[in-house]
Amino acid sequence: MAATDIARQVGEGCRTVPLAGHVGFDSLPDQLVNKSVSQGFCFNILCVGETGLGKSTLMDTLFNTKFEGEPATHTQPGVQLRSNTYDLQESNVGLKLTIVSTVGFGDQINKEDSYKPIVEFIDAQFEAYLQEELKIRRVLHTYHDSRIHACLYFIAPTGHSLKSLDLVTMKKLDSKVNIIPIIAKSDAISKSELTKFKIKITSELVNNGVQIYQFPTDDESVAEINGTMNAHLPFAVIGSTEELKIGNKMMKARQYPWGTVQVENEAHCDFVKLREMLIRVNMEDLREQTHSRHYELYRRCKLEEMGFKDTDPDSKPFSLQETYEAKRNEFLGELQKKEEEMRQMFVQRVKEKEAELKEAEKELHEKFDRLKKLHQDEKKKLEDKKKSLDDEVNAFKQRKTAAELLQSQGSQAGGSQTLKRDKEKKN
């Protein structure tokens, strides 16, 4: 019997019974809170936007501190993601905050692939968590979760419409991260222009099918405030770490020749709304949505690529063991097929090599025969030449002998005549 069937039977047959006295499991929420507080929390924010829109300043303002960071320039050859992690403490609650900023976003002439490094970074964090989950010995409670929980998308305060770069990037990211669009440096445009700009942005997002993060309304305790805040998206924000004295209080504000803009004055901007929604009310929901929605989508796609499925082709439940066995058999079949292909390839290559060697041997024999015949011909020529030379030598010797004989005969005849003449003179 499958585990799902057992669970279903237990659920259907479960009875509600009263307790005769106090047991103690009502302290489970307190236990969970104490454990969570002791372990601490992590929250990862991705700031996407063009250089100079005040991403770093807004982060400083949101968390009421000064994060150390290098200023970005407009001369980056491509988009780079810069990640910094900080340990924050508020009361007795610890928060490991990671801020990831897109350096050089929108600064290139060709912006077609500007979104790719961002998508690759988000997927890399999902992949790292998945690899940790798939380990035999998992230590997820000590693992530093680097998955992005919230993406603050900074929109330039043009007052007209979204840039094509913004639409393309948000469309590529909406299935991977919780996008919260915000209008940066909103004090650069008038209130009437800002209202029209918000409407225009919302309309373009809907028309292009971009899914932004909606504050949850299923929890009664926050349903009203979240429903109200959803209507204010995208938030128009201003960031400032400078404090000015307004009345009798020191407040974060920006001083202009025409007046003062207070960061925490809701009549001036939506900074307080953003801080409340992002940190105080919905931080845990953002973490949960990242794990249960975006990460699960990535995990499911990856496991399906690996061949793991929950159901067979007939939509019947498929256990992990059955999936493993099916995948193992498939792998063994592929392995045998590969082995047979390699064997056939090896045999074919051996035959080809044998044919090459036979052809080479034949060529060597033919070359040997040619050289042998050439050697014999040369030898015969040399023998004929030697015989001819020997004949010439013998003929020369014969001629020499004859000449010497004639010479000796001539010498003897000459001597006889001389003696004869001498005798005649004496007489």
Swiss-Prot record:
Gene behind this protein: SEPTIN6
Family: Belongs to the TRAFAC class TrmE-Era-EngA-EngB-Septin-like GTPase superfamily. Septin GTPase family.
Coiled coil regions in record: 321-416
Taxon lineage: Eukaryota, Metazoa, Chordata, Craniata, Vertebrata
Residues that bear Phosphothreonine: T418
InterPro entries in the record: G_SEPTIN_dom, P-loop_NTPase, Septin
Region listing for Disordered, in residue ranges: 405-427
Gene3D superfamilies: P-loop containing nucleotide triphosphate hydrolases
Modified residues (N-acetylalanine): A2
GO terms, biological process: cell differentiation; cytoskeleton-dependent cytokinesis; protein localization; spermatogenesis
Entry GO CC: cell division site; cleavage furrow; kinetochore; microtubule cytoskeleton; midbody; motile cilium; septin complex; septin ring
Name of protein: Septin-6
Keywords: Acetylation, Cell cycle, Cell division, Cell projection, Centromere, Chromosome, Cilium, Coiled coil, Cytoplasm, Cytoskeleton, Differentiation, Flagellum, GTP-binding, Kinetochore, Nucleotide-binding, Phosphoprotein, Spermatogenesis
Positions bound to GTP: 49-56, 104, 185-193, 239, 254
Region (G1 motif): 49-56
Record flagged with keyword RNA-binding: no
Residues recorded as bearing Phosphoserine in the entry: S27, S416
Annotated spans, G3 motif: 101-104
Misc. comment: Coordinated expression with SEPTIN2 and SEPTIN7.
List of residues that carry N6-acetyllysine: K367
